[in-house]
């Protein structure tokens, strides 16, 4: 167990391996009354409630500061907590943020997994996380390292196709900025091959048109 302030410890067995995420279900492996114990840990500053039913253990080296993970990190943690390790991933604008293609902050996190899940309002910052039912095994995803543990994120090329799945409405929407920046990062051959494999040729055509219109 890791010692935190006020001599309160978060049992490793209560965490959702291999992350710092906790839920009532994961805490029940240690506590008879998990809800009460999670409240105790939160009141002691050992964990943070990030959404209804979901908590994060504060790392030892962050316990004295105002530590708060980014929206993308929280989204990745929730995806793993809900779907299990290797079954949830960041996609869409969240993936674009991770890849550095969307500098401006957004208020919504986007995650995918093998089943549908209701949106979760965040308790620690304005915003919410939306979930989409998609099988990550059918997508091109990459390993993602976060403060809360390992996760997955759609590749640059997959993110381009995802964000270009619908017509672009105006240049002011964040998808436009994200796709233009991602196209500059992408491997053209890999993108074309992926588009052919996942029936994304129409999406690729939109992305190419968007890039051409920018010049």
Which stretches of residues belong to each language-model region?
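N-terminal low-hydrophobic presequence detector
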Residues: 1, 5, 60-61, 68, ...
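Alpha-helical residues within the helix-turn-helix
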Residues: 29
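Hydrophobic alpha-helical interaction segments
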Residues: 108, 136-215
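Short amphipathic alpha-helical interface segments
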Residues: 2-26
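Detector for methionine-enriched segments
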Residues: 1, 21, 133, 183-185
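Short gly/ser-rich loop at a beta-strand->alpha-helix junction or flexible surface loop bordering the NTP-binding
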Residues: 18-25, 35-142
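Exposed alpha-helical structural elements
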Residues: 10-11, 37, 69-78, 94, ...
């Amino acid at each position: 167990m890791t010692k935190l302030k006020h001599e309160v410890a978060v049992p490793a067995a209560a965490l959702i391996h291999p992350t710092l995420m906790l839920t009532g279900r994961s805490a029940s492996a240690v506590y008879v009354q998990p809800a009460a114990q999670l409240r105790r840990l939160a009141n002691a500053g050992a964990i943070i409630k990030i959404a209804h039913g979901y908590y994060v253990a504060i790392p030892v080296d962050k316990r004295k500061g105002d530590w708060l993970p980014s929206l993308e990190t929280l989204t990745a943690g929730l995806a793993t907590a809900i779907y299990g390790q290797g079954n949830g991933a960041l996609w869409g604008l969240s993936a674009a943020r991770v890849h550095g293609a969307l500098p401006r902050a957004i208020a919504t996190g986007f995650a995918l997994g093998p089943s549908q899940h209701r949106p979760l309002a965040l308790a620690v910052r304005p915003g919410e996380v939306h979930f989409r039912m998609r099988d990550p095994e059918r997508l091109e995803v990459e390993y993602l390292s976060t403060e809360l543990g390992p996760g997955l994120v759609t590749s640059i090329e997959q993110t381009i196709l995802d964000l270009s799945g619908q017509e672009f409405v105006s240049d002011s929407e964040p998808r436009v900025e994200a796709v233009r920046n991602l196209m500059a990062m992408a491997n053209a051959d890999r993108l074309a091959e992926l588009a052919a494999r996942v029936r994304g040729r129409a999406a690729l055509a939109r992305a190419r048109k968007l890039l051409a219109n920018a010049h």
